[in-house]
Amino acid sequence: MKELPDYFVQVPEAFALVEEGVYRCSGVLSAEQIKYLDTLHLKTVLILSVEGPSRALSQYMKTTGIRRMHLGMTRWQSNLGWKPVSEELIKDALECVLDKSNHPLLVVCSSGVRETGTLVGCLRKLQHWNFNSIVYEYRSFAGGKGKYTQELFIELFDTDLVTLPPSLPEWFVEEQRMWAQEQQQRFSELYAMPVDSQG
C-alpha cells in the first residue's frame, strides 16, 4: 500500500473508542482512513456484517497480519423474524470483544451502525448500564439510521447467553467488581431497615 503523508490521514466514519483496547467504525474505509488505523496497533478486526470489508481494509489486514474474524458471514441467518441480527452473532461477538487476547480490536460492519451499534448496546447491558444511557449512545451513532427493532433487541438480549472468556480485560473485571459491591451494599441496606411493627 502506498504511504500517504500524515496530512492525508482521516478518522474513519463512525469511529470511537468503546473501551480500552476496543474500537468501532464503519467497515467501508478509504486509504486515508486506513492510515489512521496504524496508530491503533490493531491485533484483530471483528467484522459483523455479511458483506466483506472494503478492499482497502482487506489489503491492510493482509499486509499487516491483523487477524480477521468475519462472524457476520459465519453466523448469518436468513429468517430472524423481527430481529435485526441473530443472537448467536451478538453472543459470539461479545465473547470475542471480552477476550483480552484479541485486543487491540476493531469492530466493524458495513454502516458502522446496525450490527456494531447492536453489539455495543449489548456490551453496555453486560456492563450494567442504565437502558436510557444505552439507547442514548446507540442513537448518537445511528442518527437517522437508527431502528426501534435494534433498541428492542438490545433490551431483550439475554446476557446469560454469553460465556465470559478466561482472559477478561481489566475494565470489565473492575466494572463487575463494582457492580457486585453495589448489589451487596443495597442488599445489606435493605435488610438493615427496621421493620414497622404497627403495619
Model segments located where?
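Cys-dependent protein tyrosine phosphatase-like superfamily
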Residues: M1-V107, S111, T118-G199
